[in-house]
C-alpha cells in the first residue's frame, strides 16, 4: 500500500489556493487537499493554473485542469502571463511571472500551497551549490515561507517523486506531461534526468541526506538572524535605508551578513559575494561628492546622506509635461510613477476657471514656498528638504498655467496656498 503524508500541520488556514499546473506533482497535491477538505468541511479550496504560452499544448492543458477541477468541485482561476526577455533566462522569468500571478490572485486570509517535493529540494540545493551559494542559498526551500503578506506552504516537501507517482497510479489520477521537462538543456532537468539517477543508484538516500543538509543550513541562518538582530536594528532607518556609519567598524564577514539581511528585507535577489563587494566598494565607499549607483535588473542601490537605498530604477522626467484637463479625477503618471489626485480639504487653492492644470518635473526661476523666508531655486529647496537626487526629477510638480503650486508631499508655494477653507490636497500614490 502506498503511503503519502500531507504535512497537515502546515494547514492552519482554512482558505487555501493550490498552484495547479496539471502535472503529476500538483495533481497529487490537489487530490490530497480535496481529501483534506472532505474531512474538514470548513476548508475553502481554490486552484490556480498559469498559462505561460510557451508550449503549443498550453490551451489543452487549461482544458485538462478545468476538467479535473470541475470533477473535484474546486474553483479554478486561469491566469495568462506574458513573458518578455528581461535577461533572467526563460526559467527564471517564467517563475517570476508565475509567482507574481499567484500574489495577485490570493484573497485575504488565503495561503498558497505548492507541490514541491523531496527530489525538488535536492535539485534546488544542488543548483545553489553550483552557483557557489552560502548557507542562505543552501537552505533551499522551507515548508513554510512568507509570501505576498501571507504564507507559501509546501506540504509535500518530505515526499519523493516516486511516492507521488505511486499514489497517483493507485488512485487513478490523470496528469499532463510537459514536453519541456525532457529537455536537459535546462539545468534542473539535467539534474533530474541525468545526474540524480546516478547519485541515487550509488547512494539511494542521497535526496534525504541533501534535505538534512539544507535543514542544517536553514538552522544556521536562523541562528545568525537572532545574533545579528540587534546590529540590524541599529543600522536600519525608519525609511528602510541602511546607515553606513555602524558598518564601518565591522569585520568584512559581519558587514556582508548585515548587507544580505537588509537586501532580503527589501525583497532583493540574493546577492553574490562579488555583488556585495561591489556594493561596498563602488557605492558605500565612493568619494563624498559622488552620486554612486549600482544597477540590479530594474532596481538599483544608491548612497545618499551616508545611507544605502534600494530603489526602483526610473528614468528622469525633467522634460515631461502631463496635461490634467479634468483635475477632479486621478491622473496617471509616466514611467510607472503612479497616480496623483486633488482631494478636498487641504492647503492648496483650487485652480481658477481660466487656469490649465498640469504635472511637470522641473521648475525654473526663484520660488517662494510656504514656511520659508526669501526665495530659492528648486535645486536648493530639494537639498534643504533632504530629497535624494534621483527623486528630484521624478517628484510630481503641480502647475496651474505657468505657476508652480506644489511639489507632491514636499512643499506648497505662496502662489498655491489656499485663501479660504475650500482648499485641496495633492495626493501622490507612487
Curated annotation (Swiss-Prot):
Belongs to the tRNA(Ile)-lysidine synthase family. The N-terminal region contains the highly conserved SGGXDS motif, predicted to be a P-loop motif involved in ATP binding. Its main location: cytoplasm. It holds the Pfam family ATP_bind_3. Ligates lysine onto the cytidine present at position 34 of the AUA codon-specific tRNA(Ile) that contains the anticodon CAU, in an ATP-dependent manner. Cytidine is converted to lysidine, thus changing the amino acid specificity of the tRNA from methionine to isoleucine. It is found in: Cytoplasm. SMART domains: TilS_C. It comes from the Bacteria. It is an enzyme of class 6 (ligase). GO terms for biological process: tRNA modification. It comes from Salmonella paratyphi B (strain ATCC BAA-1250 / SPB7). InterPro entries: Lysidine-tRNA-synth_C, Rossmann-like_a/b/a_fold, TilS/TtcA_N, tRNA_Ile_lys_synt, tRNA_Ile_lys_synt_N, tRNA_Ile_lys_synt_subst-bd. GO terms for molecular function: ATP binding; tRNA(Ile)-lysidine synthase activity. GO terms for cellular component: cytoplasm. Keywords: ATP-binding, Cytoplasm, Ligase, Nucleotide-binding, tRNA processing. ATP binds at residues 21-26. This is tRNA(Ile)-lysidine synthase. The gene is tilS. It catalyses: cytidine(34) in tRNA(Ile2) + L-lysine + ATP = lysidine(34) in tRNA(Ile2) + AMP + diphosphate + H(+).
